[in-house]
Amino acid sequence: MSRIANCFAELAGKKALIPFITAGDPHPGLTVSLMHGLVDGGADIIELGVPFSDPMADGPVIQRASERALKHKVGLRHVLEMVAEFRRDNATTPVVLMGYLNPLCAMGYTEFASRAKAAGVDGVLTVDCPPEEAAELESALDAHGLDTVFLVAPTTPPSRVAEIAKLARGYVYYVSLKGVTGAGHLDIEDVARKIAALRQQLPLPIGVGFGIRDAATAKAIAAAADAVVVGSRLVQEIEAATPETAREQLTRLVAELKAAIR
């Protein structure tokens, strides 16, 4: 059983909290400490963003985080080194890399999958790789025991959901809003209806992200979803903090979110 599958099994119906931060933001030396801070606050799974120069699915907050990381020359190899360092003290919390296809292509899917597995990565979510084009990547990841996590949007047709159901492992990430990360306001009832429909096609846990900025919204989403994903709000916290206070502030915010979804 993968670490992700084991995480959901151990939750036994309780809801998972999946925080997102960008590797290398605000600087590379702080990322591993922040990851441990997320766990201290109650994170069940960590989504770790791979910095990219053209993060088209991300709003201004996460775009700025990528820019800060890229100023420090943080690339995919550095991100894998950070995961390996995190694993020296944490062998249980699943880590999912979230990013774009180009850096994986540049490394080569098989080489990437091998290095990711060795580092202690558990899953990979590429926001710009549709299921129709994912077979080669999914095959490389699966051969190394890594889960392929897919996005499902409000506009995803049932035919594409069916394709995702064949390839996805670990969990599925439902994008609760049209547009970029950190934007808009959620229609909780609509999200609940969409998740109920998706459950007819998807056998995996469903996490919901985009637009979850506070404990009240997290609690409302958790009533319908298996996991709550929070990214922009946490990255915003990092942006506003000093390097000395960032971990403590993240831990506090994650603890508030975790308490809300229990």
From Swiss-Prot:
This is Tryptophan synthase alpha chain. GO terms for molecular function: tryptophan synthase activity. Its EC number is 4.2.1.20. The keyword Thylakoid does not apply. The alpha subunit is responsible for the aldol cleavage of indoleglycerol phosphate to indole and glyceraldehyde 3-phosphate. Belongs to the TrpA family. GO terms for cellular component: cytosol. It comes from Chromobacterium violaceum (strain ATCC 12472 / DSM 30191 / JCM 1249 / CCUG 213 / NBRC 12614 / NCIMB 9131 / NCTC 9757 / MK). HAMAP family: Trp_synth_alpha. Keywords: Amino-acid biosynthesis, Aromatic amino acid biosynthesis, Lyase, Tryptophan biosynthesis. It holds the Pfam family Trp_syntA. The active site is at E47 (proton acceptor), D58 (proton acceptor). The lineage of its organism: Bacteria, Pseudomonadati, Pseudomonadota, Betaproteobacteria, Neisseriales. InterPro entries: Aldolase_TIM, RibuloseP-bd_barrel, Trp_synthase_alpha_AS, Trp_synthase_suA. Tetramer of two alpha and two beta chains. Transmembrane segments: none annotated. Pathway: Amino-acid biosynthesis; L-tryptophan biosynthesis; L-tryptophan from chorismate: step 5/5. The gene is trpA. It catalyses: (1S,2R)-1-C-(indol-3-yl)glycerol 3-phosphate + L-serine = D-glyceraldehyde 3-phosphate + L-tryptophan + H2O. PANTHER family: TRYPTOPHAN SYNTHASE ALPHA CHAIN, CHLOROPLASTIC, TRYPTOPHAN SYNTHASE, ALPHA CHAIN.
